[in-house]
Regions:
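Flexible, low-complexity linker/boundary loops enriched in proline and small hydrophobic residues
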Residues: 28-69
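Active-site helix/loop of acyl-thioester processing domains in fatty-acid/polyketide metabolism
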Residues: 68, 100-124
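Residue-level recognition of beta-strand microenvironments
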Residues: 71-73, 141, 155-157, 183
Length: 185
C-alpha cells in the first residue's frame, strides 16, 4: 500500500479516538434502595397529614407529602410517601392522555420530607428551602394511583444547611434518586 494511505488511516484513527473520548456516555447503574422497605408496613403512617401540616408550611397544590412511615434520627433516615391522585393539578397538562408526575414534583416531595426531618431534629422553625440538587437521576414513572415512597438519609446536618441522599420508589422499583441540599432562608 502507498505510504500516504497509511498516513491517512493513522489520522483517521487519531481523530476518531479523540472524538470517541469526547462523546462517550458514562452509564451509572442505580444505587441500592437506601432502606429495606420489606421490613416496613408501607400502609401504616406514624405521622399523618394533619401533623405534617404543623411542621411543613406548603399547602394546596404544593403540598406534596401525604404521610410519614418511619422517622429514625439515630440512623439518620426518614421514610414518607405521596399518594398520587387523579386530581393532581398537573394531570390535565403533563401529559394529556398519559399523565406522568413531573420530576421536579418528585424532588419537591422529597425536599418536604427532608424539611420535616430537619425541623424535627433541630427544633428550628425557620424555613428550609432548596440550596441545590445534585446527581439526580430519573429511572421510572409515577402516575395517578401510585404511592410514591420517599426515602431520605441525612448526610450532613448543620444550623443553616442540611444534605440528604434521597430516593423515590414505586412498587419496589427505584424511580428517582439524588442529593438534596437544604438551606435556611
Amino acid at each position: 500500500m502507498p505510504e500516504t494511505y497509511h498516513y491517512y488511516i493513522k489520522i483517521f484513527f487519531y481523530l476518531f479516538s479523540d472524538f470517541h473520548k469526547q462523546f462517550t456516555i458514562k452509564v451509572v447503574m442505580p444505587q441500592e434502595i437506601l432502606a429495606d422497605l420489606e421490613t416496613l408496613d408501607l400502609n401504616k403512617s406514624i405521622v399523618d397529614i394533619e401533623t405534617i401540616r404543623t411542621i411543613i408550611p406548603h399547602r394546596y397544590e404544593m403540598e406534596q407529602l401525604s404521610g410519614i412511615i418511619k422517622f429514625d434520627p439515630e440512623q439518620g433516615i426518614i421514610i414518607g410517601y405521596k399518594d398520587v391522585s387523579q386530581k393532581e393539578f398537573w394531570v390535565r397538562g403533563h401529559i394529556p392522555g398519559r399523565p406522568l408526575m413531573p420530576g421536579v414534583l418528585m424532588l419537591e416531595a422529597a425536599a418536604q420530607l427532608c424539611t420535616y426531618y430537619y425541623k424535627k431534629t433541630t427544633q428550628d422553625d425557620r424555613f428550609l428551602g432548596f440550596g441545590g440538587i445534585d446527581k439526580v437521576k430519573f429511572r421510572g414513572k409515577v402516575v395517578p394511583g401510585d404511592r410514591l415512597i420517599l426515602i431520605a438519609k441525612n448526610r450532613e446536618l448543620r444550623a443553616r444547611r442540611a444534605i440528604f441522599d434521597t430516593q423515590g420508589v414505586v412498587d419496589g422499583k427505584l424511580v428517582f434518586e439524588g442529593v438534596i441540599i437544604g438551606m435556611v432562608v
